[in-house]
Curated annotation (Swiss-Prot):
The keyword Isomerase applies. GO terms for biological process: 'de novo' cotranslational protein folding; cell division; chaperone-mediated protein folding; protein transport; protein unfolding. Gene3D superfamilies: 3.10.50.40, Trigger factor ribosome-binding domain, Trigger factor, C-terminal domain. Involved in protein export. Acts as a chaperone by maintaining the newly synthesized protein in an open conformation. Functions as a peptidyl-prolyl cis-trans isomerase. It comes from the Bacteria. It is found in: Cytoplasm. It comes from Burkholderia ambifaria (strain ATCC BAA-244 / DSM 16087 / CCUG 44356 / LMG 19182 / AMMD). Belongs to the FKBP-type PPIase family. Tig subfamily. The keyword DNA repair does not apply. GO terms for molecular function: peptidyl-prolyl cis-trans isomerase activity; protein folding chaperone; ribosome binding. This is Trigger factor. Keywords: Cell cycle, Cell division, Chaperone, Cytoplasm, Isomerase, Rotamase.
């Protein structure tokens, strides 16, 4: 008899599964007989427990297992016979009306949607481009110099000078202070510290605190009011005004290393050649710019594809992805050292919108890849692995590391497929190139 698949909505379907009771009972009997060979009961040797006693104790459990297995097998058979593309897991419920000779269940499930991708020629993509010149190299060198900063006591003569005649604390100085904070003349937790170091101008402290420390000399103190922001992380003091007294203990001025051969050697240029150093920095910046522009344009392409595509999204797939995102969030918390992160109460609902986008995009990409032969080729995967390995000291070891793990290789394959999709769409869409600075590019990619 043909199976009747009921249409319950856009993607929801239902089919009735019928299992002959005699077939189910035969399987139950067979499993109980097998179980009896090993079951243990007080007063009986192993394997010598009467079959009737085994059946009395285990028949309910065995029946549930057999029904679960049979239902799953029958649903699989029906889905293949009816060419059903089932999305997610079906739910099974006993029918209210049961025949005498068969078990009857309703299987409710969702199917994959039809994906309609519009005309790619109507898609609009803004492609960021950037060029690396001397200004970008100089800015990078400034950052590298600041990462290697040394501090020296202000006013004390040393190898690099004394920091100038003015010994008051200035922007960029590392200062060490004692401070006492009170709210309504009562000290509060975290409001008092001794020998507390921070760099003026880095923004680690609240603006009022930094302003109060600026201009002080060693031994001087200043009392000032500080209003904590309403959204301050310390809830006990958020929105309140405290009175602080800060005492300057030490002032150290920053000394940045000169850009010379020694500096170049510290960056890995063995012979200290400054021209080689700048060339290597430029190469690294160009590689980073390429990576960031690829990331930004990929997001632009994905957004464009979603705008021109029509499809219904299976709820089951969204729920599965929500749970996947919850687990990813817990893993992230665990890596940050948060206690009991694996049991953190993270509501799946907070990922509903993100999960729907991910699932929808996955369905669109799968359709586009299948329709246009955009699967990753082995040589493409190897080329990307080689490119990635270039930035490491031992590229061959990185390549071996990739190819020794199927999961890592699968991630690279997914990256190549996405790149194929991006290139394919860019070849057909309305693309506008926009020149941006490296700093703007970095900011845009961090927000993407």
């Amino acid at each position: 008899m043909a199976n009747v698949v009921e249409n319950l909505g856009k993607l929801e379907r239902r089919v009735t599964i019928s299992l002959p009771k005699d077939t189910v009972q035969k399987e139950i009997d067979a499993r109980i007989q097998k179980l009896a060979k090993n079951v243990r009961m007080p007063g009986f040797r192993p394997g010598k427990v009467p079959l009737k006693m085994v059946a009395q104790q285990y028949s309910g459990q065995v029946e549930a297992e057999v029904l679960s297995d049979k239902i799953g097998q029958e649903f699989f058979t029906i889905s293949r016979a009816e060419n059903l593309r089932v999305a997610g897991q079906p739910s099974f419920e006993p029918k209210q009306e049961q025949a005498e000779d068969a078990y009857a269940f309703d299987a409710t499930f969702e199917v994959y949607p039809e994906v309609k991708i519009g005309d790619l020629a109507t898609a609009e993509v803004e492609r960021s481009t950037t060029s690396i010149g001397d200004a970008e190299i100089d800015r990078t060198l400034d950052i590298l110099r600041k990462q290697r900063v040394h501090y020296h006591a202000r006013g004390e003569a040393g190898e690099h000078g004394d920091g100038g005649a003015d010994t008051a604390a200035k922007d960029g100085d590392r200062v060490t202070v004692d401070f006492v904070g009170k709210i309504d003349d009562v000290a509060f937790q975290g409001g008092t510290a001794e020998d507390f170091p921070f760099v003026l101008g880095e923004g680690r402290m609240l603006p009022e605190f930094e302003t109060a420390a600026l201009g002080l000399k060693v031994g001087e103190q200043r009392t000032f009011d500080l209003k904590f922001p309403d959204d301050y992380h310390g809830k006990d003091v958020a929105g309140k005004t405290a009175q602080f007294t800060v005492t300057m203990k030490k002032i150290e001025w920053p000394h940045l290393p000169e850009i010379d051969a020694e500096f170049a050697k510290s960056l890995g240029i063995e012979d200290g050649d400054l021209t080689k150093m700048r060339a290597e920095i430029k190469e690294n910046l160009e590689r980073e710019a390429k990576r960031r522009t690829q990331s930004i344009v990929k997001n632009q392409v994905m957004d464009a594809l979603l705008k021109i595509s029509e499809l219904d999204v299976p709820k089951a797939l969204i729920e599965q992805d929500q749970q996947r995102l919850v687990e990813m969030a817990r893993q992230d918390l665990a890596q940050r050292g948060v206690p009991n992160a694996k049991d953190a109460p993270i509501p799946a609902e907070m990922f509903a919108e993100q999960a729907e986008r991910r699932v929808k995009l996955g369905l669109v990409l799968a359709e586009l890849v299948k329709a246009n032969g955009l699967e990753a080729k082995p040589e493409q995967i190897r080329a990307e692995v080689d490119e990635f390995a270039k930035s490491y000291e031992d590229p061959k070891e990185v390549v071996r590391w990739y190819y020794s793990n199927q999961q890592r290789l699968a991630e690279m394959e997914a990256f190549v497929v996405e790149s194929n999709v991006v290139d394919f769409v860019l070849g057909k869409a309305k693309v506008t190139d926009k020149e941006v600075s490296f700093e703007a590019l970095a900011s845009a990619s961090s927000q993407a």
